[in-house]
Swiss-Prot record:
SMART domains: S_TKc, UBA. This is MAP/microtubule affinity-regulating kinase 4. Its EC number is 2.7.11.1. Residues 324-368 form the UBA domain. GO terms for cellular component: centrosome; ciliary basal body; cytoplasm; cytosol; dendrite; gamma-tubulin complex; microtubule cytoskeleton; microtubule organizing center. It comes from Homo sapiens (Human). Belongs to the protein kinase superfamily. CAMK Ser/Thr protein kinase family. SNF1 subfamily. It is an enzyme of class 2 (transferase). Interacts with MAPT/TAU. Interacts with gamma-tubulin. Interacts with ODF2. Interacts with USP9X. Interacts with YWHAQ. Interacts with NLRP3; promoting NLRP3 recruitment to microtubule organizing center (MTOC). It is found in: Cytoplasm, Cytoskeleton, Microtubule organizing center, Centrosome; Cytoplasm, Cytoskeleton, Microtubule organizing center; Cytoplasm, Cytoskeleton, Cilium basal body; Cytoplasm, Cytoskeleton, Cilium axoneme. Residues 59-310 form the Protein kinase domain. It catalyses: L-seryl-[protein] + ATP = O-phospho-L-seryl-[protein] + ADP + H(+); L-threonyl-[protein] + ATP = O-phospho-L-threonyl-[protein] + ADP + H(+).
């Protein structure tokens, strides 16, 4: 057994010895695991894992869905319940004391969050060298990838998603928690397209009147006071980021963007952005309430909940603050199932009442997560299903059962587990269980094998899992003009191919950590906040050099993946004796031309400039220091009919209840579709392996060749309509342009 170490104040117990992780003392239940009848648990297991498959605790590891230099995220299946989860595996030996402190803070914060639109933490497992965070798996990937694949959203759909985001962020603020890294990459989607906010690695607790002074976040989403080096209360920086997110959902581009940090800083501090012609007046009005330069005049989320735009289509069901229901720890059905697994009623009660994030609590919570075939998901008022069937739902709940919650607060009479129905469609796969193996050795070994340099690990629990991988191209692109027809709306035709996507797509904002905070001089703006082409004072540069992060180009692309300028910053602490912030970086304004200019609030007062330092140079140099991509080696045997590296009991494709992300459909048998996909990917010169019966993991290019590296997955899924299958493409790493080209070629070869 691996030894367990103290994680943080709490009552966690590890999944093997039942030792208390949080308090550092052994539980009186310690020996019960070895003495418990393993046969009873094996016989009653809903799912199990073969001995040769890697596992961590009670979880069978399936595949990597995100990785970085110190951690990775694995898709896993809970052996006892068959539910899919995402496990973040962190190598503690690579972290300094400051990073460890932030990690423990992230865990502590996630333990206290219980909202249907926030990724749920199920279990914490810790060994001497490794920390495992077992979290909710959002199978539909990131909002970022959704926008890449579908283009901008119509306001009706953007409103449904944004209501969920506002509810979750307001819930965090009510608990005195500020996220500080809200962006499209950290907004995940479950199987029913409900929002799940992830990555609380930069979150912190705040107290009104006690200022925070750490500059962190993705620059295009960062509030102007962060660029100025000012201290802040906390919620106001999240509110600015929400405005950027809303603009991105509706327009498919960023309001503030550019080729380098200097341009980005100038654009943000000026507060100018273009309003596309298709944006409604009400949407423009709510944006003006978010994107206010003066944080004291920025709106509050309580005010936003009463805004006209956010409640259109929800008459009588105004968005209200989320009321957290009491945890249901007395579900006799789940307890009986767990007793059949071999747990005792005493340890179940102790774990649940003490809120220990151990295997007992995780099993109980996962048993309460409904499968796709039944039960509500999400809370009334915020689910996206309202976009598709408003007459059959109330306040956005996708099930007809939600009518009982009409015109009421979210989940006022439903339990937490009813709100968060699990997004896993996969059924159990019986096989012998081998619980005596070391529960963590395989995870630690894989972490060491696949560690990549130069990145902070993604905390994403999304299906695509591409955040942690370096992009194959360092090119930075700015936003296109949203007035142009090349920005597509999301297509309703599920059989259409990705050919309608623009040639250049969105740039992913990765996560970096900076040891110093960039300073900034305050901008000098006209009193009315308007641009003056002849005499508007420019923001003085923070450094003699601009450090361009993108090659010059006349055409700018929409939110392209892999930009260093859109990476998450984390600055050091600002000492009180410092006068202010300096240095900065800026962004070129998003759309270059539009008939309408957005308004902004009264500009910030001009401040006394102070000498700049070489901090900006250090910051930009750090961001532009790229590590050459090491293509992930896709191991395993060649795909043949006689050697398949999966459990043969999984003979049916995964069921997609909501096939909104499927581009290609066919009535062919799934086996025939897989054979056609293998031929098409081979014709496209892709290197593929088949980790699951109806899933291909593919690599193309890279390894010093002329073509950039592209890593993607192709899956054959069962659609709700009988006899109809869908082909689902998911990008894991690489540029959107290369991915789109490959998808188009493979789709054409399939001739569906």
């Amino acid at each position: 057994m691996s030894s367990r170490t103290v994680l943080a104040p709490g009552n966690d117990r590890n999944s093997d010895t039942h030792g208390t992780l949080g308090s550092g003392r052994s539980s009186d239940k310690g020996p019960s695991w070895s003495s418990r009848s393993l046969g009873a648990r094996c016989r009653n297991s809903i799912a199990s894992c073969p001995e040769e498959q890697p596992h961590v605790g009670n979880y069978r590891l399936l595949r990597t869905i995100g990785k970085g230099n110190f951690a990775k995220v694995k898709l896993a299946r809970h052996i006892l319940t068959g539910r899919e989860v995402a496990i973040k595996i962190i190598d503690k030996t690579q972290l300094n004391p400051s990073s460890l402190q932030k990690l423990f803070r992230e865990v502590r914060i996630m333990k206290g969050l219980n909202h249907p639109n926030i990724v749920k933490l199920f279990e914490v497992i810790e060994t001497e060298k490794t920390l495992y965070l077992v979290m909710e798996y959002a199978s539909a990937g990131e909002v970022f990838d959704y926008l890449v694949s579908h283009g901008r959203m119509k306001e009706k759909e953007a409103r449904a998603k944004f209501r969920q985001i506002v509810s979750a962020v307001h819930y965090c603020h009510q608990k005195n928690i500020v996220h500080r890294d809200l962006k499209a990459e950290n907004l995940l989607l479950d199987a029913e397209a409900n929002i799940k906010i992830a990555d609380f690695g930069f979150s912190n607790e705040f107290t009104l009147g006690s200022k925070l002074d750490t500059f962190c976040g993705s620059p295009p989403y960062a509030a102007p006071e962060l660029f100025q080096g000012k201290k802040y209360d906390g919620p106001e920086v999240d509110i600015w980021s929400l405005g950027v997110i809303l603009y991105t959902l509706v327009s498919g581009s960023l309001p503030f963007d550019g080729h380098n940090l200097k341009e980005l800083r100038e654009r943000v501090l000026r507060g100018k952005y273009r309003v596309p012609f298709y944006m409604s007046t009400d949407c423009e009005s709510i944006l003006r309430r978010f994107l206010v330069l003066n944080p004291a005049k920025r709106c509050t989320l309580e005010q936003i909940m009463k805004d006209k735009w956010i409640n259109i289509g929800y008459e009588g069901e105004e968005l209200k603050p989320y009321t957290e229901p009491e945890e249901d720890f007395g579900d006799t059905k789940r307890i009986e199932v767990m007793v059949g697994m071999g747990y005792t009623r005493e340890e179940i009660k102790e774990s649940l009442t003490s809120q220990k994030y151990n295997e007992v609590t995780a099993t109980y919570l996962l048993l309460g997560r409904k499968t796709e075939e039944g039960g509500d998901r999400g809370a009334p008022g915020l689910a996206l299903a309202r976009v598709r069937a408003p007459s059959d739902t109330t306040n956005g709940t996708s099930s007809s059962k939600g009518t009982s919650h009409s015109k009421g607060q979210r989940s006022s009479s439903s339990t937490y587990h009813r709100q968060r129905r699990h997004s896993d469609f996969c059924g159990p796969s019986p096989a012998p269980l081998h619980p005596k193996r070391s529960p963590t050795s395989t995870g630690e070994a894989e972490l060491k094998e696949e560690r990549l340099p130069g990145r902070k690990a993604s905390c994403s629990t999304a299906g695509s899992g591409s955040r942690g991988l370096p992009p194959s191209s360092p090119m930075v692109s700015s936003a296109h003009n949203p007035n142009k027809a090349e920005i597509p709306e999301r297509r309703k035709d599920s059989t259409s191919t990705p050919n309608n996507l623009p040639p250049s797509m969105m740039t992913r904002r990765n996560t970096y950590v900076c040891t110093e905070r960039p300073g900034a001089e305050r901008p000098s703006l006209l009193p009315n906040g308007k641009e003056n082409s002849s005499g508007t004072p420019r923001v003085p540069p923070a450094s003699p050099s601009s450090h361009s992060l993108a090659p010059p180009s006349g055409e700018r692309s929409r939110l392209a993946r892999g930009s260093t300028i859109r990476s998450t910053f984390h600055g050091g602490q600002v000492r009180d004796r410092r006068a202010g912030g300096g240095g900065g970086g800026g962004v070129q304004n998003g759309p270059p031309a539009s008939p309408t200019l957005a308004h902004e609030a009264a500009p910030l007062p001009a401040g006394r400039p102070r000498p700049t330092t070489n901090l900006f140079t250090k910051l930009t140099s750090k961001l532009t220091r790229r590590v050459a991509d090491e293509p992930e080696r896709i191991g395993g045997p060649e795909v043949t009919s006689c050697h398949l590296p999966w459990d043969q009991t999984e003979t049916a494709p995964r069921l997609l209840r909501f096939p909104w992300s499927v581009k290609l459909t066919s009535s062919r048998p799934p086996e025939a579709l897989m054979a056609a996909l293998r031929q098409a990917t081979a014709a496209a010169r892709c290197r593929c392996r088949q980790p699951q019966p109806f899933l291909l993991a593919c690599l193309h290019g890279g390894a010093g060749g002329p073509e950039p590296l592209s890593h993607f997955e192709v899956e054959v899924c069962q659609l709700p309509r009988p006899g109809l299958r869908g082909v689902l493409f998911r990008r894991v790493a690489g540029t959107a342009l290369a991915f789109r080209t490959l998808v188009t070629r493979i789709s054409n070869d399939l001739e569906l």
